[in-house]
Amino acid sequence: MSFQDRTAEFQACVTKTRSRLRTTTANQAVGGPDQTKHQKSEFTRIAQKIANQINQTGEKLQKLSQLAKRKTLFDDRPVEIQELTFQIKQSLSSLNSDIASLQQVVKGNRNKPAQMNQHSENVVVSLQNSLANTSMTFKDILEIRTQNMKASQNRTEKFVASSSMNANPLINSGNSISPFADYNDPKPEANEDYLSLNLGDGANTRYEQMALLESQTDTYSQQRMSSIQNIESTITELGGIFSQLAQMVSEQRETVQRIDMHTDDIVSNIGSAQREIVKFYERMSSNRALLFKIFGIVIIFFLLWVLVT
Amino acid sequence: MSQEDAFYGKGSYGASSGNSNIPPQGFQPVYPVAGQLDNTAPYVGAVAEGTAEGIVSNGEYAVGAMGAAPTNIIGSVDQQPPVSHTSHKSRRQYPAEVFELTNTLAASPAPPSLSEPSYVMARTPSSSPYPHDRAEVGTKSLSAQFGGMSLGADGAAAMPTNELVSVDLYNQTPEISDLTSPPPPINLPLSYSATGAATSNCPPKYVRSTINCVPTTNSLLKKSKIPFALVIRPYTSLVEEDDPVPVVTDTIISRCRRCRMYINPFSIFIDNGHRYRCNSCGIVNEVPQSYDWDSFRNVQRDRWQRPELNYAVVDFIAPQEYMVRAPQPLVYVFLIDISFVSISSGMVGTASRAILESLDRIPNKEGRAKVAFIGVDSALHFFSVSPGAEEATQLVVSDLEEPFLPRNQDLLLNLRECRQGIENLLERFQSMFATTRDSSNALGPGLKAAHRLIENIGGKICCLISSLPNVGVGKLELREDPKLLGTNRESSLLHPNDSFYKSFAVECSTSQVSVDMFLFSSQYQDVATLSCLPRYTSGKTQFYHRWNASRSEDALKFASELTNYLSMEIELEAVMRVRGSNGLRMSSFYGNFFNRSSDLCAFPSFPRDQSYVVEVVIEDTITKPFVSFQTAMLHTTCNGERRIRVLTISLPTTNSMTDLYASADQVAIAQYLTVRASEKALSSTLNEARDSIISKLVEILEVYKKNLAGQNTGAAIPLQISTNLRLLPLLCLALTKHTGFRRSSHISSDLRSIALCYLSTLPTPLLMRYIYPTLYSLHDMPIEAGTVTEQGVVLPSALNLTSALLQSFGLYLVDTHIHQFLYIGKDAVPQLLIDAFGVNSLADLKAGRFTMPVIDNPLNVRINAILGKLRSLDKGSTIMPSLYLVRGDGDPQLRSWFFSHFVEDRSENSPSYLQFLQTLKEKVRD
């Protein structure tokens, strides 16, 4: 904590001092006439109220000053400034009329002692000076606000211009009006519920049909635009796919070469196998007589076995 | 009246006992007094502590002590079941009274066997003779009983209940002004608090309960079917000065030694102020010795002026034992996608210029804030600035498998020391990559590198991404399938597609790193997967649909939101806990955070524009007249100060379902249903989410019909609900028709995902506008609407969202807080167009994203004032709504989007409000 708020102590001290002074004033005023005392109290009360209101207006002015002096882009609170301006304007006008009324009261009491009149006039002049200073401050703040608004507008325009300059308007340019008209093929909705609201008027039927035709034309254009967008994205994806394919093909060159060599080996091996099979076939053909003999023996044995049983 | 009845009943018991002459039943007449004494105990304590005079305080304390002892004696007798007597005669009252006195005196010999009476006996003068002590005890117990009864009477008079008024939902148009009305009042007398300050209980903008009257048993809560939850919004403004709360600066923090609840306005001081009784668990705690001493000024201070005893929402400045390390500085790491799409759409240029404009608005009072910039495409581009240097050095890391930091220092830039270098870097950031043709996006490796950069400190990673990550870890595929939209399998598109983002979120949360996502879409962006990081690291997800900087509306919206985001005074390394009174337990937590243990929510950084929902379970029967909930959030401010924000809300208890329904808050219930349905949509299916909303509403209507509605024997049974819940069906219907939950084949998964993100994080006033947008009529608004008065800019009255109110020649404004729509009917007269927009015909108005022109015309000035007022209604939001112009004869898709906000009308898949009520009526009848 870099500082300590001792406002409460100060206010307590002020309260004590004020009460002490009030006691002294009461003692002095014992001998005065009641009417004069009452009149002075009324005057002092009104003056004090006006002074308090001027102070409150000053506080609002301070807050307005803070808001108006903000120069950072996007740090603008126009509604808050507008509201504060309205309140301050109202306060200033009401204070002005209050001070005028107070001045009338002072003029109406010309028969008072000269010293008291001088004091009253001094109080009125002092209040008028405070109000004038507050009004001047208000005017200065409004001027600053106007300048800052112009500067902020210029900077905003520069900001937008630089952003636009950097951006490619073609990207995301279509279908900006509705977030639901993207990614998909938009199917034109009939919207009977909404269109039928106006069909009660017979006079509007013709215009409604024309509007519907116009909508259909717009829908057709939007459809074509969406299709083109889809084709564009598909082509982009295909480009990526082909790039990956080329990369895979280059990576697999050695593998393909080895496969080719293995294929040649396979061909020669198959040739050798074929020659062996041909030899075996010839040997099997020459042994045909032996097969017949074995087959005959088996049949004879079978017949004997059957006769015995 | 109730007290007299109780007294009379007691008399009847006494009479019967006298007649029967049965000694064991001699204790029955004392039974009814026990409850009253127990209920009024807090009064005795409060009164005792409220008095400053020592003499009177001692006397009151003695009465309180005596009041406790008889309660214990009677408590032991309470175990016997009460015996009911049906016969009584009025002429027996006087003898019964005498008998009661005899009984009380007869009970006196029992105390020596109990510990509490011994405590009481110890306080009597030891020099007194024993018979005198006995007589004194008897006398004081009698006075305690009578005192308790009188206090009970005062309590009954001081605790009015909310009136239960039934309305027939069919016979009236929904009163949408209820959405902005205050919730049902919490009828808790201020005498329960230590100081009686009007700010002792929590205002609804911070903590809002679904029921402002808590049932004493879980069975009553279950029978009522009303969910019990708290909606907590610890901050209501982006910067502290817009909504300051009292700060306790002397680091004297007193907490209950058992339940650890902080001292609060409802703590009960006893023992002449030296001790206090915890309002949560009832245990007695010591007050710190220095509690009444102002060590800075060396004077005695008034205890009752301490902020934590007068305000329900306070900030404590934490002492040393609440810190585990030096306070963390504010750190932002900007992960900027510099792929071809980002450069072409203008995102990189707009972002760098917006950050440049925001450097003065980042909170940096102590000069400790740090920033870092990492460009992401097929490689990682780091930028190094030495302190005092005027130029930045770019360091490119091409290794994406194991991304490393190319330099040990000067990558994390102190905002004040490296200011010139940062400014030069941001000015040339766009031109550095203007000629890129690289379409890669290595977001995963970039996140890993950023995490490695700040994992020892903590901070925020701000991702600005325009394309789908397609390189390295965490790359995502194009899985959007239009054929799945509107079917049951659509829910799979809302689930995360890659486990990297969940596991990385856990790593970030552990090292106090928070991730925010700003997503700009050219095509599919997979918001469902990328929003996992913000969800578990207490960040946020922003989505800019088909964004292009050449449209000034897009550029200004993003720049405004980014600067608001950077100027927010976030809290760092925060943990939040919600504690409740005995018998209450927090069961579920909803929002963007990481649940570290069962009831501790961890926030690497705490944003000021979100809210959280906590569900409450009643575990034990509540015996006190009120319960308290305390939300404590220990955090480090962005200015390096360790603080604890404490929000305390106390709610009265009841055992009446009528009181329960009369105190229900429809807005809080709607918010609870919203966040629960959002979680269901993300964890299971959209159908279950929609069904959970409708089924809860049907349950509430069933209970109301069976238990609370008037006995209606007519043939036509009305659909009734209490006045304070009459908008709940409309809010549930609007919720099921919302972008996040509506059954439709035209809502892409990205739009649905971002809608669910908003639904689960928006604070209550903004969420209500998001669910049920506000409709204003501008062509015939009152003369004072749009003008500035003492109360600020006057808004016109809100209309119901039904297109029956729309005229074909009118001008209307719909505000959802995220978007604003101006609808101009096709039959608008040229004078209206000239006054409002400065154009002569409808053909001159360009539909779509729109900037309201500023011309010197009263109607235009008023409309601009209304638009500005709506944008600044809530100081706790970073969102700047997009304005769209919809023409009555314009684009059908834009019009269907506009009319989809009219939730009281029938649409393709949803019923109208009256049809919805008919459906509810049929379900309730079953």
Swiss-Prot record, chain A:
Q: Which PANTHER family does the entry link to?
A: SYNTAXIN, SYNTAXIN-5
The places in or outside the cell where this protein is found are:
Membrane; Golgi apparatus membrane
Belongs to which family?
Answer: Belongs to the syntaxin family.
* Membrane topology value: Single-pass type IV membrane protein
**A single cellular component GO annotation:** endomembrane system
For this chain, the annotated S-S bridges are: none
- Gene that codes for this? sed5
Q: Which residues form the t-SNARE coiled-coil homology domain?
A: 218-280
Q: Name one GO molecular function term.
A: SNARE binding
Q: Which GO terms describe its biological process?
A: endoplasmic reticulum to Golgi vesicle-mediated transport; intracellular protein transport; vesicle docking; vesicle fusion
Q: Which organism is it from?
A: Schizosaccharomyces pombe (strain 972 / ATCC 24843) (Fission yeast)
Chain ranges sitting on the Cytoplasmic side read 1-288
Q: Which residues cross the membrane?
A: 289-308
SMART domains associated with the record: t_SNARE
Residues in coiled coil = 37-66
Give the protein name, as stated in the record.
Answer: Integral membrane protein sed5
Q: What does this protein do?
A: Required for vesicular transport between the endoplasmic reticulum and the Golgi complex. Acts as a target organelle soluble NSF attachment protein receptor (t-SNARE).
- Primary location recorded for the protein, binned into one broad class: membrane
- Provide the alphabetized UniProt keywords: Coiled coil, Golgi apparatus, Membrane, Protein transport, Transmembrane, Transmembrane helix, Transport
Instruction: List residues in topological domain: Vesicular.
Output: 309
From Swiss-Prot, chain B:
Q: Where in the cell is it found?
A: Cytoplasm; Cytoplasmic vesicle, COPII-coated vesicle membrane; Endoplasmic reticulum membrane; Golgi apparatus membrane
GO cellular component terms attached to this protein's record: cis-Golgi network; COPII vesicle coat; cytosol; endoplasmic reticulum exit site; endoplasmic reticulum membrane; equatorial cell cortex; Golgi membrane
**Which CDD domains does this one have?**
Sec24-like
Identify the keywords attached in UniProt to this record, alphabetized: Cytoplasm, Cytoplasmic vesicle, Endoplasmic reticulum, ER-Golgi transport, Golgi apparatus, Membrane, Metal-binding, Protein transport, Transport, Zinc
- Membrane topology, as annotated: Peripheral membrane protein
UniProt feature, compositional bias: Polar residues: 73-85
In this chain, the stretch annotated as Disordered covers 1-21, 73-93, 107-134
Q: Does the keyword Metal-binding apply?
A: yes
Positions binding Zn(2+) in this chain are 256, 259, 278, 281
**Gene Ontology process terms (BP):** COPII-coated vesicle cargo loading; intracellular protein transport
- Give the primary localization class: cytoplasm
Region (Zinc finger-like): which ranges? Answer: 255-281
- One GO molecular function term? zinc ion binding
Q: What subunit structure does UniProt give?
A: The COPII coat is composed of at least 5 proteins: the SEC23/24 complex, the SEC13/31 complex, and the protein SAR1.
Return the PANTHER family for the record: SEC24-RELATED PROTEIN (PTHR13803), SECRETORY 24AB, ISOFORM A (PTHR13803:SF39)
Please explain the role this protein plays, according to its UniProt record: Component of the coat protein complex II (COPII) which promotes the formation of transport vesicles from the endoplasmic reticulum (ER). The coat has two main functions, the physical deformation of the endoplasmic reticulum membrane into vesicles and the selection of cargo molecules.
The family line of this record is:
Belongs to the SEC23/SEC24 family. SEC24 subfamily.
- What is the name listed in the Swiss-Prot or TrEMBL entry for this protein? Protein transport protein sec24
Q: Which organism is it from?
A: Schizosaccharomyces pombe (strain 972 / ATCC 24843) (Fission yeast)
